[in-house]
Design a protein with these regions (language model features):
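C-terminal alpha-helical cap of glycosyltransferases
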Residues: 343-360
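Short acidic alpha-helix that forms the nucleotide-activated donor recognition element
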Residues: 49-56, 233-240, 248-258, 279
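Nucleotide-activated donor-binding/catalytic signature segment of Leloir-type glycosyltransferases, i.e.
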Residues: 33-39, 216-244
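Hydrophobic beta-strand scaffold residues
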Residues: 82-84, 226, 284
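Active-site and donor-binding regions of nucleotide-sugar-utilizing enzymes
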Residues: 1-153, 157-158, 178-180, 193-198, ...
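Catalytic binding pocket for nucleotide-activated donors in carbohydrate/polymer assembly enzymes
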Residues: 113, 250, 255-339
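Conserved catalytic-core segment of nucleotide-activated headgroup transferases in glycan assembly
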Residues: 1-12, 154-231
Length: 360
């Protein structure tokens, strides 16, 4: 989003076409940017459909993000002399190994990309193991350049005060971007938390919207008192779980929380975005599967802004330790925020690299 907003500002007379591959992505894009952009679903990576798509839109430049390597799209753009850039590029060890299995397909695609801007040196190194290019640069991670609305802090303070019990603020754990089976572990941990902190509140936000109903049933089966964000149900004194079954509200829900557990990490998925809660100064917890964000997680662990947990028991113990020791909680959140702030600046670097092709 930071890159899109900057392109809109810097090139007000250019037409910006943004593609997505899912209805969720489409909905978020339209909600946040509306008529400032045009939206289309990206065609499948088959030449017939791609040529039709490119004939219709006739783009001057193609900007791909992170891991979006579409061999046919890239190769066709090369033949059409459409400048192609892969920005905020990342490549985990697992993805690199998978790409090497199809090197005859992936290597030419990477070689045909005009500009590659990797997030970190480790990403650059993995790209070089696939294709020997001397012109790959690193810019950091664009997600560090996200801005948190200034009014969010005041709004969240008011809501947390409304949720207080007997004048005491409730300790709030958010479990965000959870995947299948992780909710079971989180709920197990939260029941242990309630023994020592009976007024604690859990905000549970599944990663995929198609699982919202399933997760709601899991919470109901656990016997915990539940309200649903999508139904605009109020959090009352006896509420134990708020289900975040809406789209585009994760930053808002983070702002209401004290500690964040970020999912996709207790299972072998590689983790999810740690930067959104770090940007709000939350103490962080994650499972051990962090390969998708290894550079960021390594920094957070080193600064003691992220605790790696491996079970429901460890999750409950760490949360209790943090909320019962306000100084430790504050220090951990500040450490996470420091990592976030010191890594900002990728947006300006990327814009500088894109200036020439955008003005050509």
């Amino acid at each position: 989003m930071p890159l899109l907003r900057r392109l809109i500002t810097d090139h007000p007379h250019s037409e910006l076409l943004v593609t997505t591959t899912t209805p969720t992505g489409s909905r978020l894009l339209i909600e946040r940017l509306g008529n400032k952009i045009k939206h289309q679903y990206l065609p499948v990576d088959i030449p017939f459909f791609l040529n039709y798509f490119l004939n219709k839109w006739n783009p001057k430049i193609l900007i791909l993000l992170e891991t979006e390597i579409w061999p046919n799209l890239i190769n066709i753009c090369k033949r059409r002399s459409i400048f192609t850039a892969l920005v905020n590029a990342r490549l985990s060890e697992k993805s690199k190994d998978n790409y090497l299995k199809y090197n005859s397909l992936i290597k030419p695609a990477i070689e045909n990309i005009d500009l590659i801007l990797a997030q970190f040196e480790s990403d650059k190194r993995r790209f070089l193991e696939i294709a020997d290019r001397k012109d790959i640069n690193t810019c950091g991670n664009l997600k560090f350049d996200q801005d948190i609305p200034s009014e969010l802090e005041d709004i969240s303070k008011t809501i947390k005060q409304d949720w207080s019990t007997d004048g005491e603020l409730r300790p709030i754990l958010i479990a965000a971007s959870t995947h299948e089976t992780e909710e079971d572990e989180v709920l197990k941990a939260f029941k242990k938390i309630l023994i020592s902190s009976p007024n604690a509140l859990l905000i549970l936000v599944p990663r995929h919207l198609e699982r919202f109903d399933r997760v709601k049933k899991i919470i109901q089966a656990s016997g915990l008192a539940l309200v649903s964000r999508s139904k605009k149900e109020d959090v009352k004194k006896n509420t134990q779980v708020l289900l975040g079954d809406t789209i585009g509200e994760l930053n808002f829900l983070y702002s209401l929380s004290d500690v964040a557990f970020v999912g996709g990490s207790l299972i072998d998925h590689g983790g999810q975005n740690l930067l959104e809660p770090a940007a709000q100064g939350l103490a962080l917890m994650s499972g051990p599967s962090l390969r998708n964000f290894s550079d960021i997680s390594d920094q957070l662990i080193e600064k003691e802004g992220l605790a790696v947990i491996r079970s429901a028991e460890e999750l409950s113990e760490k949360f209790i330790e943090l909320v019962e020791n306000p100084d430790v909680l504050k220090k951990s959140g500040e450490a996470a925020f420091e990592v976030f702030m010191t890594n900002r600046g990728a947006l300006e670097k990327i814009i500088n690299y894109l200036q020439e092709p955008l003005q050509a």
